[in-house]
């Protein structure tokens, strides 16, 4: 396993981050396709055996069950000081006022709830899951700074927002002398490259690492175009990401298949290798629900695409509508 520094920090993270949205309780939350605890634990254990030390979850995943499953597995299989646990705040955790968002009340309540579910007294990376247009960014950044100073988080990160919003947050923290974001968990893959326009140049300039979610486009880059899975058939959010660009996306998927065939490797390795070679990507967030998912992710670290292959993969791309959770409302 290869390791890199996260952003401009001294924190070492594996070049693959295990995304834990697929682990939890199928009966809790919005996704019936998630694995239960018994099914999830072998993937977390296998990731550790591969040298993966970076694990990403969120309070909203499986209504908190993901954090519970991840916390118990890591406690059983690893030493706390040897793993990097990342979680997120923003999503609705209870109905009514103050049940979601990035107010001081929500952040200070939810960090304690996440720590309790994870069974730890701190997280390594505490991320805001989305931008909150209903809370002043000064309130959010000060609350996050206080979380760090209280020892409940080592670093903070952000996810899925416009570049101008991220710059505003960075500027606010710098101007006030508060803790600064070190990572951006954004939506980036061969089927969606709009982040190359503003967010990636901003992160390069500011020394912020990318930890992209959905690097395999929810599996679309790994299988035949017409092939369906339980998740692809029931994942309503996923359908909204790709419904309008199907014909253009098909050409990219076919190009991935061609290069994978020429290299004699699975398509997932080609798609992940492309993300891994993007700067300033530290670690793509890879979900694993089958044993070969982790095998392919780790193998992708050794696959170096040529400039010609990268050009061939990128050539069919057409501009997409901005998506990936970027919206004006909670």
Task: Kindly give the residue locations of the regions a language model identified.
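N-terminal binding-site loop/beta-alpha segment at the start of enzyme catalytic domains
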Residues: 1-83, 330
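Glycine-rich beta-alpha junction loops
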Residues: 89-91, 162, 188-192, 214-221, ...
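Generic structural signal for well-ordered alpha-helices
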Residues: 44, 67, 71, 111-115, ...
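Glycine/proline-rich, positively charged
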Residues: 26-27, 92-194, 198, 205
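Terminal-tail/helix-coil boundary detector
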Residues: 1, 41, 205, 229-262, ...
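Structural preference for beta-strand elements that scaffold enzyme active sites
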Residues: 13-17, 53-54, 82-86, 122-125, ...
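Aromatic-lined glycan-binding groove of carbohydrate-active enzymes
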Residues: 194-231, 266
């Amino acid at each position: 396993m290869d390791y890199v520094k996260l952003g401009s920090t001294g924190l070492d993270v594996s070049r693959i981050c295990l995304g834990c949205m697929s682990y939890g309780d199928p009966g809790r939350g919005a996704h019936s396709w998630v694995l239960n605890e018994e099914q999830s634990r072998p993937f977390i254990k296998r990731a550790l055996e591969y040298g993966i030390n970076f694990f990403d979850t969120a309070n909203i995943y499986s209504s908190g069950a993901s954090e519970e499953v991840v916390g118990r597995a890591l406690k059983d299989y690893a030493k706390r000081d040897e793993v990097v646990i990342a979680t997120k705040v923003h999503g609705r955790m209870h109905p009514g006022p103050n049940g979601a968002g990035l107010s001081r009340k929500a952040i200070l309540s939810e960090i304690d709830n996440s720590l309790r579910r994870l069974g730890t007294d701190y997280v390594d990376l505490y991320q805001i899951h989305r931008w909150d247009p209903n809370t002043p960014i000064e309130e959010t950044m000060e609350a996050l700074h206080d979380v760090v100073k209280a020892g409940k988080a080592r670093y903070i990160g952000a996810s899925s927002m416009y570049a101008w919003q991220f710059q505003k947050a960075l500027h606010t923290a710098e101007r006030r002398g508060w803790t600064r974001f070190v990572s951006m968990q954004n939506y980036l893959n061969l089927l969606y490259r709009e982040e190359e326009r503003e967010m990636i140049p901003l992160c390069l300039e500011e020394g912020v690492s990318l930890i992209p979610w959905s690097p395999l486009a929810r599996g679309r880059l790994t299988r035949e175009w017409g092939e369906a899975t339980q998740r692809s058939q029931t994942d309503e959010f996923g359908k909204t990401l790709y419904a309008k660009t199907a014909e253009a996306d098909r050409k990219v998927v076919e190009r991935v298949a061609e290069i994978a065939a020429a290299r004699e490797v699975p398509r997932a390795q080609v798609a992940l290798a492309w993300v891994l070679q993007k700067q300033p990507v530290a670690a793509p967030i890879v979900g694993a629900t089958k044993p070969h998912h982790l095998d392919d992710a780790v193998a992708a670290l050794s696959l170096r695409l040529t400039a010609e292959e990268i050009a061939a993969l990128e050539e069919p791309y057409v501009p997409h509508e901005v998506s990936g959770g970027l919206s004006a409302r909670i």
